A protein has these predicted regions:
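Active-site phosphate-binding/coordination module
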Residues: 1-90
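Hydrophobic/aromatic beta-strand patches that form the interior of the parallel beta-sheet core
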Residues: 11, 36, 177-179, 196, ...
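Phosphate- and divalent-cation-binding pockets in alpha/beta enzyme and binding domains
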Residues: 20-23, 130, 161, 187-188, ...
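Asp-based, Mg2+/Mn2+-dependent phosphohydrolase catalytic module
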Residues: 191, 195, 199-232
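Short, structured coil segments at secondary-structure junctions
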Residues: 28-31, 39, 134-138, 191-192, ...
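Hydrophobic residues within well-ordered alpha-helices
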Residues: 3, 39, 162, 188-192
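Short active-site oxyanion
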Residues: 7-11, 31-33, 116-118, 174-175, ...
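Conserved acidic, metal-coordinating active-site core of Asp-based
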Residues: 66-188, 200
């Protein structure tokens, strides 16, 4: 809030899709100018949808068929819904999301799906390499570790979201500051000079950032903003 009072624009830049960001009460309580969602594929600024990119229909069946062929647990992520593969048992992570969002869940097999990206979990039978190859015409693979994978359309990333907004507001990248903590933040941490890693972030990212702040629970974001004189 102090950052915005001082005339700066504040955005959430998330891999999550729109509903999974704006329906989090703690995010709304803080207050942001906008949201870069779905790894750059959906950008909302003060209620205006500046960019909405969804997976082309010709890729829908290819993703679902490949997930079943190579035994990957699949979750399609859209601006309004999660799409669950109900043909296989759910692991704890998928079940938790299914239970948390009863008004935002659909079956992957319904027609006319609308999604921006997807994630997968490996199973004991998974052939991850073959799955990644099968969907590679459309998607970039981010290995999140622990058998969890994130797949974003080639033309979009957290970095492209930053560039879109910089162009929109006539800013240079030197005017942009980014704070991240995990591997799906790597594109934006590499893209912007003033890149900041949370103290509790993935250790391998330390070599990719300009500054490492304190842990999230030790006022890491506030301390980073103070370090760069963005707030007093």
């Amino acid at each position: 809030q102090e950052l915005r009072r001082r005339g700066h624009l504040a955005f959430i830049n998330s891999g999550r899709t729109l509903f999974n960001v704006i329906e989090q009460p703690y995010i709304l309580r803080i207050g942001f100018d906008g949201y870069v969602c779905a790894c750059g594929a959906h950008i909302l600024y003060r209620g205006e949808h500046l960019l909405t990119a969804t997976v082309p229909s010709e890729a829908h069946a290819a993703v679902i068929d490949a997930a079943r062929r190579y035994h990957m647990e699949l979750l399609l992520e859209g601006p309004d819904y999660f799409y669950f593969d109900l043909s296989i048992p759910m692991n704890a992570s998928r079940q938790s999301l299914y239970d948390r969002f009863p008004n935002h869940r659909e079956n992957v097999d319904i027609p006319n799906k609308c999604f921006n990206k997807f994630v997968t979990w490996e199973t004991p039978e998974s052939d991850t390499a073959s799955f990644v190859k099968a969907v590679s015409p459309w998607f970039t693979y981010i290995n999140r570790g622990g058998g969890f994978g994130e797949f974003c359309m080639h033309a979009y990333s957290k970095a492209t979201g930053i560039q879109f907004l910089a162009d929109r507001f006539g800013l240079s990248l030197d005017d942009c500051y980014v704070i991240g903590d995990s591997m799906n933040d790597l594109p934006m941490l590499d893209y912007v000079q003033h890149s900041i890693l949370m103290g509790n972030g993935t250790p391998s990212l330390r070599s990719h950032v300009e500054y490492v702040t304190t842990d999230i629970l030790d006022d890491g974001i506030e301390n980073a903003l103070v370090h760069y004189n963005l707030i007093p």
